[in-house]
Amino acid sequence: MGDINGYRLDGELTTQNAGFCKWGFCTKNKHEYFIKEFLSPVYPSNQSELSQKVIERKQRLCENFYIEKKEFYNTLSQCRTGNNVIIEDFFRAGSKYYMITDKILSEGIDPHIISKLSDDRKEALIRSILYSVAAFHEAGIVHADIKPDNMLLKQTENSFYTAKIIDFDSGFLASKVPDDVQGDFLYLSPEVFQRMSDSSVVISEKIDIFALGILFHQYWTGTFPAVTSEYHYVFEAVLDGYSPVISTQTPEHIRSMIQQMLSLNPEDRPSARTLLFLFSSVGDSHQNDLPHVQDSKKTYGFYVPTDFD
């Protein structure tokens, strides 16, 4: 087995379901880790056949990549909620960059299975996700790739479920939005699609809220919010002014919440902290009717005290 910067690989790194990286497991000081190798950028060697000018340009690009990733990971490390998978190490070895996290075991539970749970168990899972999202949003982090594959679900001893949020590779600091913001079209927000052709479109953490609205609908019903057959994706319908149909399988307060999360205007989507408060109060009291609410400067169909932070 190979060794990378003191991490002993358990086997060959693989590209399976990995996108632009390789991954695998490793150990260091008897502790098990997950390791990811970035396929790009590749740090050039001074002995390469490239011209010195090209080598220096590529080295600067790599150094900027390292600085930006390091800043992002350091910010993420402040969000140790227990439900975010924190980056434990980030380094360059030879020409490649590597990222290390704890090894986390997942039970491979898809949204359809979650939809069969009792309401209190579904609400508990959603609360655990919102708790983590609120933490990294308030630290200025945007995940930008919220979807079931990036939620490692695990059943607890009392048969409830918790989620660890993984794969922040598409993530960025809200203060430093990259030129190229993408995502899975199934969970893409309207403004991310618009940004692909218009760089002036503002991108914020509310792209995660839109994706969570779709994900929570799946967790509750096992299906996506309904749109007419002319649309392939939820964001397409929303851009055309069509409100996705939220299943009546969801309680009224959940239905209202998801509808707000799927608003065209990002400013009309509640913050993760507001949503967490909703689930902690309405969910715990088993109320189905939502009174009026104000979240900072925005008004929604449920109540949050004005001194709530």
Give the residues covered by each predicted segment.
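A conserved short helix/loop substructure at the end of the activation segment
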Residues: 262-274
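Activation segment signature within eukaryotic-like protein kinase domains
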Residues: 125-126
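Short beta-strand micro-motifs within the conserved protein kinase catalytic domain, predominantly
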Residues: 86-97
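ATP-binding glycine-rich loop module of kinase domains
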Residues: 22-70, 74
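Conserved C-terminal C-lobe helix
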Residues: 249-264
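Regulatory extensions appended to serine/threonine kinase catalytic cores
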Residues: 285-309
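Catalytic-loop of the protein kinase fold
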Residues: 136-154
